[in-house]
């Protein structure tokens, strides 16, 4: 699914299970008592498409139906259409499903898919377990396009690949456990890797996803099936949630900007162990964002303002074209301008400002400690040990993305940062 060039170049992506043979008359979509006790849940009840809808939609209009206890694609979709997603998001999980391909069929299963107007197709955010009938596929396949791959990223162990031919059922499984990923095929583990490592980012940024900046970064998202132009059948789709693990993260190493991504032409550099942001000649907006997404966390940063000092810390944010940020800013501003308040850029503007009597907590020109606790739909901010706001918002609760530091436009800004650390919750 090479993102360079036209959408025709993406036709080999096999983005979802294009399974075409007619389904068995058996209705196997049930859970054993043991599976129920272990926490498994069905994503398909064997009779309806309840729990599924169009990608970026509110209802189900794409070419899907239920036939003989199976979800079946009608074969009317394409690379850019025909996607359906689960209503619910999943973070850490074990996902198992049965699939069956027609001759030459090409498809896959996606996870951690993110919706939004900026995402026209699911595969620019969600990784894919590739499903394809290799022996009968009409075009030459590269290794990264073959059955069982983490599409265009990681290859399976071919010695462990035991697949039933087209027209027969196979079983696949994806395990995503706090960044540890496994692909299984018919009871054999064929692939495993760690997400968000240096190696992972090197593969992402130098390969097929170099023009998809948000690919694979989401820590939670939707499961997705696609009608890729061939009839497709699925059954026994079930998932078990796995627990989130707490970890301590040092965001800034005091030496360089490793693990950060700069946006815009403003200046970001390291000097004497400090991270410094400074207005550049363009006097525009600038952002320095973590390369990873962070969902729920307790973040602590220290900052010292020089000159104007108008900056901020964005939570669950992405930065798009034209250095346009999507997300929420915890304000870092000059005196009497609501440091610690929460502002939504390009949206609702101020969501909550700090009480006037707390404006004197900021030590302008000296070091300050800003703490931000983000959990679900709630954000709490603290400045120098004093709580500034406690805010709950449904939209924030649905957000995902990076942590980002801001330089405001207008020029004349210089802010020093140090001790940027967080604990995931």
Q: Predicted regions: what is each one?
A:
Residues 1-11:
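Bacterial N-terminal signal peptides that target proteins for export
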Residues 2-3, 18, 22:
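Short intrinsically disordered, low-complexity coil segments enriched in acidic
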Residues 10-20:
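Bacterial N-terminal signal peptides
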Residues 23-425:
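Carbohydrate-interacting regions of secretory-pathway proteins
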């Amino acid at each position: 699914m090479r993102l360079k060039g036209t959408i025709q170049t993406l036709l080999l992506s096999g983005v979802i299970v294009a399974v075409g043979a007619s389904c068995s008359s058996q209705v196997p979509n049930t859970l054993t008592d043991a599976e129920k006790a272990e926490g498994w849940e069905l994503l398909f009840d064997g009779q309806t498409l309840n729990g599924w809808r169009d990608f970026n939609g509110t209802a189900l209009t794409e070419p899907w139906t239920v036939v003989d206890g199976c979800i079946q694609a009608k074969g009317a979709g394409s690379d850019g259409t025909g996607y359906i997603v689960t209503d619910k998001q999943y973070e850490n999980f074990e996902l198992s499903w049965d699939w069956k391909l027609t001759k030459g069929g090409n498809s896959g299963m996606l996870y951690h898919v993110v919706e939004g107007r900026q995402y026209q197709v699911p595969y620019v955010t969600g990784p894919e377990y590739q499903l394809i009938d290799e022996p009968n596929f009409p075009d030459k396949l590269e290794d990264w396009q073959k059955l069982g791959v983490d599409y265009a990223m990681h290859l399976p162990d071919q010695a462990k690949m035991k697949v039933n031919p087209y027209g027969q059922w196979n079983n696949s499984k994806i395990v995503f456990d706090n960044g540890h990923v496994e692909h299984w095929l018919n009871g054999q583990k064929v692939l495993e890797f760690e997400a968000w490592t240096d190696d992972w980012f090197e593969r992402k940024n130098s390969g097929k996803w170099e023009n998809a900046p948000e690919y694979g970064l989401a820590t939670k998202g939707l499961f997705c099936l696609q009608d890729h132009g061939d009839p497709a059948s699925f059954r026994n789709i079930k998932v078990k949630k796995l627990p989130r693990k707490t970890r301590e993260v040092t965001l800034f190493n005091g030496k360089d900007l490793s693990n950060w991504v700069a946006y815009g032409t403003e200046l970001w550099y390291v000097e004497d162990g400090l991270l410094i942001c400074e207005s550049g000649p363009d006097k525009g907006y600038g952002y320095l964002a973590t390369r990873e997404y962070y969902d729920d966390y307790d973040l602590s940063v220290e900052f010292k303002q020089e000159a104007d000092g108008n900056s901020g810390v964005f939570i669950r944010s992405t930065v798009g074209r034209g250095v346009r940020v999507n997300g929420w800013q915890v304000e870092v501003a000059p005196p009497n301008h609501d440091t610690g308040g929460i502002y939504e850029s390009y949206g609702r503007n101020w969501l909550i400002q700090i009480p006037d009597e707390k404006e004197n907590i900021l030590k302008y020109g000296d070091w300050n400690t800003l703490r931000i606790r983000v959990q679900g739909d709630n954000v709490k901010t603290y400045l120098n040990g004093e709580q500034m706001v406690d805010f709950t918002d449904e939209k924030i609760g649905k957000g995902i993305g990076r942590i980002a530091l801001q330089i405001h436009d207008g020029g004349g800004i210089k802010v020093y940062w140090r001790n940027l650390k967080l604990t995931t919750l």
